[in-house]
């Protein structure tokens, strides 16, 4: 039985930034990439093409990693000026995210470290390096670590709760693997339904965010 979080880093970003538009999309269970493409291109969601959605997806996840206009241009195979316009349009639609990212970098420079919602820290001496490229790297880490690190903290909580629930229930099914935002249980077929419910509940309720944590669960004979 395999369960993975749906867009957990973007959900963490929505929660931490409190951006109204992104929070609204997740609360209404909308496809965030389609919604982003529609808003950035100024069209209704039903008019979004697969290419538009793919570009929006690259920006959504790229923002989490502090992507530059040069990086986005490379990833999408478009001119740098187009990538720059796309990012500017993105931040216009999600102003809370732009302000939040700037705040993350500012706080990291002030404190010397970035931290997750649960208080896990990464110290960033790179931010005071005399070398520009190293300082830029430090800024990207300052943007990304609180988001990706919080997502990592959440799945660790889910792992502990799932393990404890299986032990407490006396199940023979075992939690055997974690891969990024995904948990895998080697389950007896006679316990399948119970295990699906336990895994879903433990993952969805691992941490309370301003938007729902969504989990996709699949069962198969092999991984």
Placement of each model-derived feature along the sequence:
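Conserved catalytic core of nucleotide polymerization and phosphodiester-bond processing enzymes
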Residues: 1-223
